[in-house]
């Protein structure tokens, strides 16, 4: 099975404070899901997420390998909106790539959040991927999941 192969190749790791951020979202009834350009299946990613972040309440996981589209194509975002039964203007999307995530979410009418966090002592294969890329629309740029918690706590409900 692909899960066995993927786990043997890389056991995965949790980004700092991701668990705390998910707890806060859950406590506030904020719905969550995943859209990934991953080549592994949604089933494999779900297994990994459930193992590494057992507190997650992701309603669904969408991967490129399951739908044959890659972000920034709005197709994946539209599928997610349809599954969630939500209008784009009610959704925020967090990702680490300006091209795939931020431009993709914006193109689908979703508010984009760029996460560019570093894990001390680890090599981040995504470091520098956004260098020199500029966009001409509003998005939230964070470097730590605690920043998102702070922003969300300031929004009146």
Q: Positions of the model-derived regions?
A:
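Hydrophobic alpha-helical core bundles mediating ligand binding, dimerization, or RNAP-core interactions
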Residues: 1-8, 41-45
């Amino acid at each position: 099975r692909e899960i066995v192969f993927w786990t043997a190749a890389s056991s995965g790791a949790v980004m700092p404070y991701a668990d705390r951020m998910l707890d806060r979202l859950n406590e506030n009834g904020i719905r969550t899901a995943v859209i990934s350009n991953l080549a592994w299946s949604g089933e494999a990613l779900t297994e990994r997420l459930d193992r590494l972040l057992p507190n997650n309440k992701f309603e669904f996981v969408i991967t490129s390998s399951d739908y044959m589209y890659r972000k920034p194509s709005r197709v994946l975002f539209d599928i997610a909106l349809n599954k969630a039964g939500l209008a784009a203007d009610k959704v925020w999307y967090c990702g680490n790539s300006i091209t795939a995530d931020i431009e993709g979410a914006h193109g689908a009418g979703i508010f984009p959040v760029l996460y560019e966090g570093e894990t001390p002592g680890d090599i981040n294969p995504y470091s520098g991927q956004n260098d020199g890329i500029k966009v001409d629309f509003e998005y939230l740029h964070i470097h730590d999941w605690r920043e998102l918690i702070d922003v969300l706590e300031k929004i009146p409900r």
